[in-house]
């Protein structure tokens, strides 16, 4: 693995692009949190059943699952900045349409469109930081920290908007947030060489190509890539379970939108601190760090019903969970960025996001039916047991195949 890393080492960091790239991470992650917060509550207002909420949340990942690899390849081919600008504008426009289309089938369509567009902006931000830093874990940790600033303020903003102005204005808040991201991306100078991207774009350049998919899938044979894909799947399955029913569960306990938003914002601070703290973990096994902190994140989510009625314990548990996630993310990004050549950074991010979207599609549906069959509190226990079993399998694999050396 060390040989692979040396072989694909990137050129010097482009520090002039760092501030705007950090800002793109902030707004793209915050954008996702705004959608995570408002859509389940909007669905409850429309009278959706638990299984329907799970399907609605899962639909947000459907197009991304099929087209993330294509989107990453587009960034390699057309330029990351250009693709990010288009999908940032698309996210803002689709968000503004939600209040006018409150029927479940149309909401599913909107979820598919806005899920794809917002995920493409996040793919772009991840690709951009990999290009700008060359896979430096310290600077990627700083990028993750700034990304978490978006997750600190976005839920709080949405909670206040929901309580004070109502759901319609809340969706327009997403549009305003996307406008801020659009401006941030315009400040980034394209880090890709002019001869490495297509100048004039034709409609054929926009179509998915089989070679993009096969080329990306071949990257999964690299041990570093395969392991991080497995960790990323488990991590995103945990977040998908949280996105589906944690907010609904807290609302049922009587918490206001502002209080729920404050809980998420407070926990996001610890997520950012975890990302900044990665630089102090150098020399320790990356594989075991990822497994240990991913498992702790799953366990704390599964135990939510034990803390639900005690807000301060719930806040502490959720904050430690986010701290664990904050440590895992930059380790994962940096390991993958160093494992593949510079010219396919978009493709590797697209592959990782496809993997993540699979988790985001499957988990809400499974948890939706678990909640419907066993009750809301027991649903957390069921999904936690399943995800911890995956972590146990990963730990056995690391020990058996000595993957702790990657």
PLM segments and residue spans:
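Conserved MFS/SLC helix-loop-helix module at the cytosolic interface between two early adjacent transmembrane helices
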Residues: 65-99
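Juxtamembrane intracellular "pre-TM" segments in multi-pass secondary transporters
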Residues: 2-15, 190-228
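Residue-level signature of mid-helix packing/kink "hotspots" within the transmembrane helices
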Residues: 61-69, 151-152, 268-276, 360-361
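Structural signature of the two symmetry-related core transmembrane helices
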Residues: 82-96, 175, 288-303
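C-terminal transmembrane helical hairpin of 12-TM major facilitator-type secondary transporters
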Residues: 287-332
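Cytoplasmic helix-loop-helix junction between adjacent transmembrane helices
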Residues: 112-148
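Helix-loop boundary and gating motifs at the non-cytosolic
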Residues: 11-61, 224-253, 257-263
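Helix-to-loop junctions at the C-terminal end of transmembrane segments
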Residues: 67-79, 162, 274-286, 371
């Amino acid at each position: 693995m060390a040989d692979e890393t040396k072989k694909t080492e990137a050129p010097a960091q482009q520090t002039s692009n760092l501030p705007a790239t950090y800002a793109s991470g902030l707004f793209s992650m915050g954008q996702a949190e705004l959608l995570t917060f408002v859509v389940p509550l909007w669905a409850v207002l429309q009278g959706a059943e638990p299984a329907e909420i799970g399907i609605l949340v899962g639909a947000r990942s459907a197009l991304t699952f099929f087209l993330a690899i294509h989107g990453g390849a587009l960034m390699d081919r057309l330029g990351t900045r250009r693709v990010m600008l288009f999908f940032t504008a698309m996210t803002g426009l689709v968000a503004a349409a939600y209040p006018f289309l409150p029927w479940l089938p149309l909401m599913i369509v909107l979820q598919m469109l806005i899920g794809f567009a917002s995920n493409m902006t996040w793919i772009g931000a991840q690709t951009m930081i990999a290009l700008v830093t060359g896979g430096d874990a310290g600077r990627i940790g700083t990028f993750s920290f700034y990304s978490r600033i978006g997750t600190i303020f976005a839920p709080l903003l949405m909670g206040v908007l929901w309580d004070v102005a109502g759901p319609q204005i809340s969706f327009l808040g997403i549009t305003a947030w996307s406008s801020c991201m659009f401006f941030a991306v315009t400040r980034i100078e394209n880090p890709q060489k002019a001869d490495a991207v297509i100048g004039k774009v034709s409609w054929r350049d926009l179509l998915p190509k089989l070679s993009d998919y096969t080329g990306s899938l071949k990257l999964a044979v690299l041990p570093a890539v395969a392991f991080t894909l497995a960790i990323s799947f488990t991590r995103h399955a945990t977040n998908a379970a949280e996105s589906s029913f944690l907010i609904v569960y807290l609302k049922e306990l009587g918490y206001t939108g502002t209080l729920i938003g404050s809980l998420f914002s407070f926990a996001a601070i610890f997520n950012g601190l975890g990302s900044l703290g990665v630089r102090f973990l150098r020399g320790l096994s990356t594989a075991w760090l990822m497994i240990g902190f991913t498992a702790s994140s799953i366990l704390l989510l599964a135990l939510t019903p034990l803390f639900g009625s005690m807000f301060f314990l719930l806040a502490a548990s959720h904050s430690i969970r986010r701290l664990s996630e904050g440590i895992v993310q930059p380790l994962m990004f940096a390991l993958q960025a160093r494992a593949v050549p510079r010219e396919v950074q978009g493709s590797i991010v697209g592959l990782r996001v496809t993997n993540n979207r699979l988790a985001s599609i499957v988990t809400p549906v499974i948890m939706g039916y678990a909640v419907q069959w066993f009750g809301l509190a027991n649903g957390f226990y069921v999904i936690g047991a399943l995800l911890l079993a995956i972590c146990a399998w990963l730990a056995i694999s690391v020990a058996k195949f000595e993957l702790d050396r990657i």
